[in-house]
Design a protein with these regions (language model features):
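Conserved AMP-binding/adenylation subdomain of ANL enzymes
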Residues: 1-38, 52
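Gly/Ser/Thr-rich phosphate-binding loop
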Residues: 10-13, 36-41, 50-111, 124, ...
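AMP-binding/adenylate-forming catalytic core of the ANL superfamily
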Residues: 32, 39, 147, 152-153, ...
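Glycine-centered tight turns that cap/initiate beta-strands
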Residues: 54, 62, 86, 122, ...
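Active-site glycine-centered loops adjacent to acidic/histidine catalytic or metal-binding residues
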Residues: 70, 94, 117, 173, ...
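Beta-strand->loop->alpha-helix junctions that form or flank phosphate-binding loops
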Residues: 90-97, 117-119, 221-224, 266
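Conserved ATP/PPi-binding loop(s) of AMP-dependent carboxylate-activating enzymes
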Residues: 118-122, 133-162, 200
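Acidic/polar alpha-helix N-cap and adjacent early helical turns
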Residues: 287-291
Length: 291
């Protein structure tokens, strides 16, 4: 949103600041009052808007671009967003250490791509294994970045764990790069679940669960398991009270390898989120540990 605001100001656009985006009714009133051309947000915000019947009554003819950042957009959200607004969701990636942005999809994109786009000019990105070896096209590892907009060190701490030997920042994101140079992010390295030696990316499991029409939103974490090291636990917010564990398990078993399927499912009234709407998995891990 910050980068979109700067871009908007640079071309003379009027900015409308929604001070409480969690007030979906109030948010929709603002969108109805002011024709909007660009709408940036996080996936959970778009999910909440889509669940409100009044959102579908808005006039989207002026809107030219919707951008998701901060967390991955789920395919189901992108699909429903296109059906309601007629617009694709475009994703980008960045962090504070890259001045907010490091990759972006072309603004003239017409379809949801499932990736976060291409490195910006003067930015170099590669994918590395745990020994800092650069991986081949489409291989999965940690995304590392270097460029004019990327920090070169942290102040007053040992930087060896945060940078490669040749000066690339380790982002902590598990990713791959395709033949065209587009980056696909699978998950945060710290959120990856290891079940009997196999890697499970929470985003992949969440994408499947959110395909169920009775699911409002969900989040997946790893919990300690004496036999497997870790097992998968899903926290699910219902969109329909008739939803049950068997519904979730059947969907996952149909679409995921057995080790990726949640062994534990807990229904919850709402997911813990940051002030900008990002789901806080560390709080869910703490909740699971205390259970």
């Amino acid at each position: 949103a910050f980068i979109c605001s700067i871009v908007g100001l640079s071309v003379g656009q009027h900015l409308t600041l929604v001070t409480n985006p969690r007030d979906i009714e109030g948010f929709i009133k603002i969108l109805r009052k002011r024709p909007f051309h660009l709408l940036p947000g996080v996936n959970t915000l778009f999910q909440a808007l889509l669940m409100n019947p009044k959102f579908k009554e808005l006039d989207f003819s002026a809107c030219q671009l919707t951008v998701v950042g901060g967390m991955a957009a789920t395919p189901e959200t992108a699909k429903r967003w296109r059906e309601v607004t007629g617009l694709p969701i475009l994703e980008g990636w960045g962090m504070s250490e890259t001045l907010g942005v490091g990759t972006a999809n072309p603004f003239n994109g017409t379809e949801y791509s499932g990736n976060v786009g291409f490195p910006l000019p003067s930015v170099d990105i590669n994918i590395r294994d745990d020994d800092e070896n650069i991986l081949a096209i489409n291989e999965v590892g940690e995304m590392c970045i270097k460029g004019d907009n990327v920090i070169t060190h942290y102040h007053n701490i040992d930087n060896t764990t945060f940078f490669t030997a040749d000066g690339y920042l380790k982002t902590g994101d598990i990713a791959s790069m395709n033949e065209q140079g587009a980056i696909k992010i699978y998950d945060r390295k710290k959120d990856m679940i290891i079940v009997s030696g196999f890697n499970v990316y929470p985003n992949e499991v969440e994408n499947i669960i959110e395909e169920h029409p009775k699911v409002a939103e969900c989040s997946v974490v790893g919990i300690d398991d004496k036999l497997q090291g870790q097992s998968v636990k899903a926290y699910v917010v219902k969109a329909d009270n008739s939803l049950n564990e068997d519904d979730i398990k059947a969907l996952c078993q149909e679409n995921l390898a057995a080790y990726k399927c949640p062994r534990h499912i807990e229904f919850i009234d709402e997911l813990p989120k940051s002030t900008v709407g990002k789901i806080l998995r560390h709080k869910l891990r703490k909740l699971a540990h205390e259970a």
